[in-house]
Amino acid sequence: NTIKANLLMKNITKYKIEKDKKLFKEKINLFNEKNFTPADYNKTKVIFILGMPRSGTSLVEQIVSSHHAVFGGGELSYLNLLVNEKITNNSEIFYKSNNIFNNLQKEYMSMMSNKNKNFLNFTDKSPLNFRWIGFIINMFPNSKIIHCKRNKIDVCWSNFKNKFEGALNFSNDLQDLKKYYQLYENLMQFWEKKFPNKIYNLEHEELINNSEKTIKNLINFCNLDWDKNCLKHHENKRAIKTVSFIQARKPIYKEKVKNSFLYDKYLDELK
């Protein structure tokens, strides 16, 4: 039983939404108060694919990395490590350093060099990187940011019924999920206002219902020439190490949209 299992996990992890509220507020305050000097342009373009977990990020990465000029990096932890180690835990050095974003860019690229040696474009598909968009834009001024959006009830239900390791303890309780989703929405609204025209909003429902047009617009946003292989993403043999690997290996089907309606009577807490 999903509800009983999640209740047990909530009791084990002792997750409190207040910690995430504090984190999100700190990021908004930081970028409200300061205008940073961005890093220099990097010859390698990083395509960040982010949003709520289960919003279609694996599918979008599979599409983009089917392009002949793009390396699919997968769910990388590099940015999370750098933000926590170099910024959150060393805030005094962060505020005083003039070259902090150049240094962070170099460290990130050094980590990535072990995976990608040949491509000038690669993807980083860690959904929770939406928390660090201000850092991304300053570290990689020429990066592309794809924000995957999906129906609130669908994405929250999918988080609730799929089990994750690590940072997704908010997904064990429907009330926590509802509050976390609100935090996510508020933060994304802040980023979009702070950095207009830097974030590409990709609606999951639009991708499912109008695939070819949506994919062509997406590839155009990434400043890539059109490659018809992006429409055959399900034939891409790259490894996928997330719970979405089965969906990302299949052609796009319309019945994927709004699957939560089957469980509507259980989901009043999310509305």
Residue ranges and their predicted role:
Residues S77-L79, R150-V155, L207-I208:
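Conserved nucleotide-binding/hydrolysis micro-motifs of P-loop NTPases
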Residues F130-G134, D154-V155, E185:
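Conserved coil-to-alpha-helix start sites within the AMP-binding
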Residues N1-I47, S91-F119, M139, W157-N201, ...:
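PAPS-dependent sulfotransferases, especially Golgi type II membrane carbohydrate sulfotransferases
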Residues E75, E203-H204:
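A secondary-structure boundary/capping signal
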Residues P127-N129, E206-N210:
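Acidic, metal-coordinating catalytic cores used for nucleic-acid/nucleotide bond scission
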Residues K27, F36-F140, K144, C148:
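Phosphate-binding active sites in nucleotide-utilizing proteins
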Residues I17, E75-S77, R150, C230-L231:
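Proline- and acidic/polar-enriched loop/turn elements at helix boundaries
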Residues T57-S58, K152, S211:
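Conformational gate/switch positions in structured elements
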